């Protein structure tokens, strides 16, 4: 059994930040459970481009509002607490935040925790945790 709090993660290698977001990586590849689980916060009035070519991601919005844009279809979806979106087709997408958004994210395959988005908005293919 694994039990963790976000307080334990703050300031460790599991607490990853970029220009407009912060992700607390609660469950990672080295936990050996087949997925990773993150609490991610994206800043208000920001736009983020993502394209998880090597991962499937499920996202549950718990706080804030914004818009999800599917670049492949042009469809836009409002984001608010209680909304889930699943990127099961590796869709290139944009998240536009009207307010600070907090979300819970599940990745398969799991991430190691230190991945950085490349120029296309993707994480690299899954690698072994060190």
Swiss-Prot record:
**Gene3D superfamilies the record matches:** Jelly Rolls (2.60.120.10)
RNA-binding as a keyword of this entry, yes or no, is: no
Q: What EC class is this?
A: lyase
A GO BP entry is: ectoine biosynthetic process
Query: Pathway, according to UniProt?
Result: Amine and polyamine biosynthesis; ectoine biosynthesis; L-ectoine from L-aspartate 4-semialdehyde: step 3/3
Q: Name one Pfam family in it.
A: Ectoine_synth
Renumbered to this chain, the signal peptide range is none
Q: Which reaction does it catalyse?
A: (2S)-4-acetamido-2-aminobutanoate = L-ectoine + H2O
- Please verify whether the record's keywords include Protein transport: no
What Enzyme Commission number(s) does the record list for this chain?
Answer: 4.2.1.108
- Molecular function terms from GO: ectoine synthase activity
Paired cysteines (S-S): none
Concerning SUPFAM superfamilies, the annotation shows: RmlC-like cupins
Q: Which UniProt keywords apply?
A: Lyase
Could you say which protein family the record assigns here? Belongs to the ectoine synthase family.
Function, in words:
Catalyzes the circularization of gamma-N-acetyl-alpha,gamma-diaminobutyric acid (ADABA) to ectoine (1,4,5,6-tetrahydro-2-methyl-4-pyrimidine carboxylic acid), which is an excellent osmoprotectant.
Q: What is this protein called?
A: L-ectoine synthase
**Source organism per UniProt:** Mycolicibacterium gilvum (strain PYR-GCK)
């Amino acid at each position: 059994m694994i039990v963790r709090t976000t307080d334990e993660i703050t300031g460790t290698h599991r607490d990853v930040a970029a220009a407009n977001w912060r992700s607390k990586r609660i469950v990672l590849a080295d936990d050996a459970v087949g997925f990773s689980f993150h609490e991610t916060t994206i800043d208000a009035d920001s736009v983020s481009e993502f394209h998880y070519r090597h991962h499937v991601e499920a996202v549950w919005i718990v706080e804030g509002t914004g818009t999800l844009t599917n670049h492949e279809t042009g469809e836009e979806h409002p984001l608010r607490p209680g909304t889930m979106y699943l990127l099961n087709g590796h869709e290139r997408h944009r998240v536009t935040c009207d307010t600070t958004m907090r979300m819970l994210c599940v990745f398969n395959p799991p991430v190691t925790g230190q991945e950085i988005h490349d120029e296309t908005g993707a994480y690299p293919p899954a690698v072994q945790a060190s």
